[in-house]
């Protein structure tokens, strides 16, 4: 995606988020979300249209093309990972974490993204440590908190309609990166919506994705539970 500047990536991401639950976004909605004048939105939309990332007719709604959706999901996945790290791990306030993620998401390489994913994967199947009040002078570790592995399974074993939280991606190399770039990363919620002979459809951020059988078998999930 070398033909996309950080600014154009931001526009794609904004449109993608506006289209959650809808297939449309309007110029004034984009301008409001980006805190810019409507007159500055049109040139960016025209450029994205020329590059094949969206369809745009003046005064009408904007729709992302398939390549536009792929590009938007890729950049948004990086944003979510970075936000999780700054907010959940480092304890940065949400608004500040969001600003940091917005600034860094454009520069995060595939390798950098994968390292963040590995970090969250290493945490995702561990429950909170259970405190052990016993003190054994012969075995100092007896009082150390012990983590328990959370029950998990792969996405192919989940019934349609059930929400799950992604824990790990077991695919390797380019196949793994393809899944990550779809936005399927640790701690996000998926809902399996339908099955076909060659894969399944899932709902992610109110957008529908198709996953092949091979991809489905490589996605480790935890059953979603509400509090």
Regions found by a protein language model. Give the residues of each.
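Alpha-helical residues within the helix-turn-helix
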Residues: 32, 49-50, 88
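The short coil/loop that forms the "turn" connecting the two helices of the helix-turn-helix
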Residues: 35-36, 59, 92
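Basic, amphipathic "hinge/linker" alpha-helix immediately C-terminal to the N-terminal HTH DNA-binding motif
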Residues: 60-79
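C-terminal regulatory/oligomerization modules of transcriptional regulators
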Residues: 105-164, 168-173, 199-203, 207-227
């Amino acid at each position: 995606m070398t033909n996309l500047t950080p600014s154009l990536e931001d526009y794609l991401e904004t449109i993608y988020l506006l289209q959650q639950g809808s297939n449309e976004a309007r110029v004034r909605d984009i301008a409001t979300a980006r805190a810019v004048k409507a007159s500055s939105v049109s040139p960016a939309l025209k450029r994205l249209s020329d590059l094949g990332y969206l369809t745009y007719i003046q005064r009408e709604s904007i729709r992302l093309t398939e390549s536009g959706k792929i590009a938007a999901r890729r950049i948004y996945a990086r944003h979510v990972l970075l936000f999780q790290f700054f907010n959940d791990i480092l304890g940065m306030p949400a608004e500040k974490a969001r600003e940091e993620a917005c600034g860094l998401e454009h520069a995060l390489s595939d390798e950098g993204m994968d390292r963040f994913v590995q970090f969250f994967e290493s945490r995702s199947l561990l429950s909170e440590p259970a405190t052990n009040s016993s003190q054994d002078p012969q075995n100092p570790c007896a009082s150390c908190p012990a983590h328990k592995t959370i029950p998990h399974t792969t996405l192919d074993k989940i019934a349609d309609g059930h929400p799950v939280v992604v824990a790990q991606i077991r695919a390797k190399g380019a196949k793994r990166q393809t899944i990550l770039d779809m936005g399927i990363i640790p701690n996000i919620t998926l809902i399996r919506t339908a099955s076909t002979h060659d894969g399944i459809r899932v709902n992610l951020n109110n957008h529908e994705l198709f996953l092949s059988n091979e991809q489905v078998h490589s996605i480790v999930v935890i059953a979603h539970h509400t509090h």
